[in-house]
Amino acid sequence: CSSDLFESIYGPVYYSFDAGNVHYVVTPMPGGDHAPGYTSDDVCRWLKNDLAHIRPGTPVVVFNHDLLTYEDTFIFKSKNAGSINLNEYNLKAWVYGHWHINYMKKQGDVYSVCTSSLDKGGIDHSTTAFRVMHVDSKGDFTSELRYTYLDKNICIASPAGVMASGVLPVAVNVYSSVSPVREVLYTCLADGKPVLKNKRLLQSTDWSWNGELPLSHKYVGKELTLRVTARFNNGEIAEAESNFICRTEKTVPLFSADWDNLSGNAKHSAPVSAPLNLPLQLAWTNNVGANLYMTSPLIHKGKVIVASVDEDLKGAGHVYALNGKDGTILWSCPVRNSIKNSIAVDSDIVFAQDAQGFLYAIDTETGKLCWEKQLPVNGLPALIDGLVAGEGVVYAGTGKGLCAFEARTGKQLWKNEGWGQGEGTTSTLTLGNNLLVAGAQWNALYGNDAKTGEKLWAVSDNGLRNRGASPAMHGALLYLISDKSFFILEAATGKVIVRKPLPYNVDVTSTPLLTDKEIIFGSAQKGLIALDSETLEEKWTCPVGDALVYTCPYSRQPSATIETSAVWAGDIVYVAASDGTVYGINKEDGKVVWKHATGAPMFGSVALSGNALVVSDFGGNVYLFCK
């Protein structure tokens, strides 16, 4: 709309105000769908005059539709009215939107802060959230993302079901949009009588509270009850209750093959595992102390490896290795910013790329940094793609910042020149048959020669420009979902072999799983979908609960969302959902045969090895189930 209409409804498009000792400046975007009633000269003259009238040294925070610069110096320029260096006026932060992403970084002495939509999923599948900034008298601030639509949500993730006796892990996810949690207390009862009363849990993240429940041998075989009370800063209370039974025998994870990439391998083909005995028992859970987003857990030589996000730039971004036997943290390696998508292992090195475009190579045994690179990606949007590794090479980045490196040395082998970066893209690179398949959100799906980096093909029709999901490679074919269709492509050429339109939105980060009879994938609003692999007709749908946090672009309530990729063991497929539950589903009829609720959304895919199933939640908890 025109600025005249905007101003007639909302008031001026550029203005300033003081709050405390800080001067806040609201500036307009330079243009839009219609020519605005102001010019860059008008705004620059006004801005110069405005800042000339504040006390020297006053902290300044500027709001605008978009980021002014990728550089460390913030210079507001005009056509004929000169320019003004905002760094000379004690600029503390530049707060912007436009990209529909959650991304915070430091540019020199200035923080740039972007927040996605508070009522719907972001363009890059960012969480629905609003940002609270706590600013002190010096203009220094802390940031806090608050996730919308949650009203005193509480769930006991552990203990639940059948547990091994001894000291039990207590994990509670609790969240409310309007108020942080002040404290969480638990009471354990046997036959209605307290065994332990009003014990305090420790806060691990904005979602999760954790502790331990010591139980003597006399409670073995008895059904016990855990009651939890959470008190919020605004005085509200939430309560939950869980029944569980202690047994003397411990469930011991016995790992087999490594799970080194998304869906187990670089082709993301999710090979079938041996059946898991149901019901699965929680062998252990541990919280890493930071939120876990789309970085699906890996299993490598007895270790579980995950990586965290740092949406508020408080130093929370790390890669972690946990002992697969008991969940203890073996090492953590700090990174500069959020790691938002798939990590991978090759040559006993784990690779991760952060939102600022840094690629990290970390020794899986020691957690020591082997090497790192600044990828030549654009300053915006944030790098949230998943990487892939295989046969001694790691592939990372996106657009003309997509590169191949020797895994052990970091030597660059090639850099993509054939296609450019898109919007924030949640798909993970797929590797196989000397082909690297990548995507750029709102642009296309691309095939590059894995040895040379040469662009071989691009496809964008019929919704393939929406690049949320990653393709699975089976033989000479690619299987993927996009927008409102399921596709089979010829991998070598990108030729569409099959396109099946679907009556629902599948713009999710879910790689299709091929079983012996089904093709199974997540959806934005209908839960898990299975097509008959011969006829491609819908075989079943398995509904799940409403997403605790919305992530699919422009999705709102109600949305039974699955942003993850399913895996299979025997006749059961396992999948994690945005409703905070991991499900075991009979692949023949779509019926739920096992589930475990955590109370925090699950954006990372399940990992399988031997008798163990590993999954993580957004609250920072990692869970290992086995039987």
Residue locations for each model-derived region?
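Extended active-site neighborhood of metal-dependent phosphoesterases/phosphodiesterases
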Residues: 1-59, 78-93, 101-144
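Blade/loop signatures of beta-propeller domains
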Residues: 252-282
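Short loop/turn segments that connect beta-strands within beta-propeller blades
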Residues: 323-326, 363-367, 406-410, 449-453, ...
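Extracytoplasmic beta-rich repeat domains
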Residues: 266, 285-300, 308-317, 330-344, ...
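Aromatic sugar-binding surface patches on proteins
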Residues: 203-214
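Short, compositionally biased P/S/T/A/G/V-rich stretches that sit at domain boundaries
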Residues: 139-171, 175
